[in-house]
């Protein structure tokens, strides 16, 4: 495969080169030009919403090239904490030292912003001095505080004709011919995702047309985790198994839990099961190193081990395969918002109780039992951990959450009363010390004339003796 990915090599450098999004681009131009004319729009953020591969990210970079902006790109999936995002945004408030280039702050995957951090990011948007552009596949999954402050620009899904035309233009520039039926199949399987179609085309051209059936057979942009597991456990072909995580909306560490849970249900012989567990053990080591060092290129080796490594471990059971969700997290039953709330609770436990993530996870399970059975104690934990109403509801359920929240109000009121008493005591102490200092000063002032008078009497006595 060529060194340079075609998706980057042939990325449009002008807005006019973007495929079939004229209506959206018209709004984008009007918005950015209001910044350039010194009259920032009322909504200082722009939200590009639409399906994958429709041109959202390409729009940002074409816009920057055409209007001479520098892009500072962040990803909500990676830079989730407010402090990190705030640091980048703060750094971008001013222009370069020479003042030649302005900056566009680009936050990709805005539909992955944690709800707990949304209010603070909204404040950053309010005080922004540079354009902020966000991209999301699902508009309604962007937190409301962010949506309310952003101008919405909707991108439509590209049709097969649009995708094929773009692929043909690339092939002409490469001087390559590909059978029409393969181009049609690529466009069909892409579901309007031009980025995915270009990647598939480059893979097929590099590997030969005999690989086309494998690449295209597993192209499913909305693939579920069950389909991904099927690709790992129903194949003994390492090359095909590696495609399991392609376009799956799940991190490698989460997918590893699913693979781990299902190995006992899929393998017949103990020695084969052991080989599969050895593969995911190595994957876990790579993931841990990536997390500790920040070197996420190690993910590639982890993914290879948890997919290809497991696939070639031995003979799987024949027939229909029923897959099971991980018991530890029960991720199947949780929506993305619920996972976000769960992660927020775990972080608060780690911070306030000085625990590791694993310890915090176990503690959260205990807290769930407490919140379901001891509402008074639950209220105290709520105040101690500074839990939100949604987090209380996550731990206790809707019926009990309201009662617990009501109890926290009285606890907070008592805390405030105690704080007021303590503040008053401190103030009284300060006033008492100040009064004592004033009395001491007054006493010193009163003693000065006496000392001087005494000194005067000594001189007079000396003179008297001298005279006599």
UniProtKB/Swiss-Prot annotation:
Positions annotated to bind ATP: 50-57
Function of the protein: Part of the RFC clamp loader complex which loads the PCNA sliding clamp onto DNA.
Transmembrane spans: none
InterPro entries on file: AAA+_ATPase (IPR003593), ATPase_AAA_core (IPR003959), P-loop_NTPase (IPR027417), Rep_factor-C_lsu (IPR023935), RFC_lid (IPR047854)
Protein name per the record: Replication factor C large subunit
GO BP terms in the entry: DNA replication
Keyword ATP-binding: yes
Lineage summary: Archaea, Methanobacteriati, Methanobacteriota, Thermococci, Thermococcales
Similarity annotation: Belongs to the activator 1 small subunits family. RfcL subfamily.
Subunit (UniProt): Heteromultimer composed of small subunits (RfcS) and large subunits (RfcL).
Disordered, as annotated region: 422-456
Cited Pfam families: AAA, RCF1-5-like_lid
Molecular function, one GO term: DNA clamp loader activity
UniProt keyword list: ATP-binding, DNA replication, Nucleotide-binding
SMART domains xrefs: AAA
Composition-biased stretches (Acidic residues): 429-444
């Amino acid at each position: 495969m060529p060194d340079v990915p075609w998706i980057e090599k042939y990325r449009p450098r002008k807005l006019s080169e973007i495929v079939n999004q004229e209506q959206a681009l018209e709004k984008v131009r009007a918005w950015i030009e209001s910044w350039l004319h010194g009259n920032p729009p009322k909504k200082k953020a722009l939200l590009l919403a639409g399906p994958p591969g429709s041109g959202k990210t390409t729009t940002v970079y074409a816009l920057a090239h055409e209007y001479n902006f520098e892009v500072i790109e962040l990803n909500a999936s990676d830079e989730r904490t407010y402090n990190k995002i705030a640091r980048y945004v703060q750094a971008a408030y001013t222009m370069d030292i020479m003042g030649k280039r302005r900056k566009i702050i680009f936050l990709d995957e805005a539909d992955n912003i944690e709800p707990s951090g949304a209010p603070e990011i909204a404040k950053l948007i309010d005080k922004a001095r540079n354009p902020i552009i966000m991209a999301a596949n699902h508009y309604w999954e962007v937190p409301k505080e962010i949506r309310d402050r952003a101008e919405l620009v909707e991108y439509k899904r590209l049709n097969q004709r649009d995708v094929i035309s773009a692929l043909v233009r690339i092939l002409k520039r490469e001087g390559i011919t590909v059978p029409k039926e393969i181009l049609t199949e690529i466009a069909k399987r892409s579901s309007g995702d031009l980025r995915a179609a270009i990647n598939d085309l480059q893979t097929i051209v590099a590997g030969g047309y005999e690989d086309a059936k494998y690449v295209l057979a597993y192209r499913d942009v909305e693939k579920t985790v069950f389909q991904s597991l099927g690709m790992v456990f129903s194949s003994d072909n390492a090359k095909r198994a590696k495609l399991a995580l392609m376009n799956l909306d799940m991190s490698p560490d989460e997918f590893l839990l699913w693979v781990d849970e299902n190995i006992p249900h899929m393998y017949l012989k103990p020695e084969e099961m052991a080989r599969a567990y050895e593969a995911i053990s190595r994957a876990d080591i790579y993931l841990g190193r990536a997390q500790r060092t920040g070197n996420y290129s190690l993910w590639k080796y982890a993914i290879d081990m948890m997919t290809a490594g497991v696939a070639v471990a031995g003979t799987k059971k024949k027939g229909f395969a029923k897959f099971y969700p991980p018991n530890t997290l029960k991720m199947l039953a949780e929506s993305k918002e619920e996972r976000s709330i769960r992660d927020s609770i775990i972080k608060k436990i780690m911070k306030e109780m000085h625990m590791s993530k694993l310890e915090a996870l176990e503690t959260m399970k205990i807290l769930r039992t407490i919140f379901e059975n001891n509402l008074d104690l639950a209220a105290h934990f709520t105040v101690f951990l500074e839990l939100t109403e949604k987090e209380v509801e996550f731990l206790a359920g809707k019926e009990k959450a309201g009662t617990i929240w009501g109890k926290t109000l009285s606890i907070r009121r008592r805390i405030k009363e105690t704080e007021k008493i303590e503040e008053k005591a401190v103030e009284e102490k300060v006033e008492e010390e100040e009064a004592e200092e004033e009395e001491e000063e007054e006493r010193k002032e009163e003693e000065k004339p006496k000392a001087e008078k005494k000194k005067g009497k000594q001189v007079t006595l000396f003179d008297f003796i001298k005279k006599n």
